[in-house]
A protein has these predicted regions:
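Catalytic domains of riboflavin
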Residues: 1-123
């Protein structure tokens, strides 16, 4: 297996190409499919759900989480555990929240600067 250079990965990331980022063998020793949130189209979300089959997550800074009132799912986890928040769906232009379209819409809502807590539902 070959790995891309950082420059190649950044170029592809900017273009919206999904990448597999591999962590350290001393941690989980696994790869995560990542894509720029601004490029998370329904087709990309569908690919991630179909091929990677894991949770689709949106990493966010603490200030943004606070602004959206997204609390941690579990307080004070172990240092290497993922810090998940409560799950959310966008309120506008979604149906059940599970389709690729709905998930892409939720990602777009999470990163839009005018989105507030009132624009999200907790399923």
């Amino acid at each position: 297996m070959s790995f891309a250079t950082v420059a190649e990965a950044l170029r592809d990331f900017r273009r919206g190409k999904p990448l597999v980022v591999v962590d350290d063998p001393g941690r989980e020793n696994e790869g995560d499919v990542v894509v720029a949130a601004s490029k998370a189209t329904p087709a990309v979300i569908n690919f991630m759900a179909r091929e990677a089959r894991g949770l689709i997550c949106v990493p966010m800074l603490g200030d943004r989480l606070d602004a959206l009132k997204l609390n941690a799912m579990v307080e004070h986890g172990a240092p290497r555990e993922a810090a998940f928040t409560v799950s959310v769906d966008a309120k506008k232009n979604v149906t059940t929240g599970i389709s690729a379209h709905d998930r892409a819409r939720t990602v777009a809502a999470l990163i839009h600067p005018s989105t507030g807590p009132e624009d999200l539902s907790r399923p």
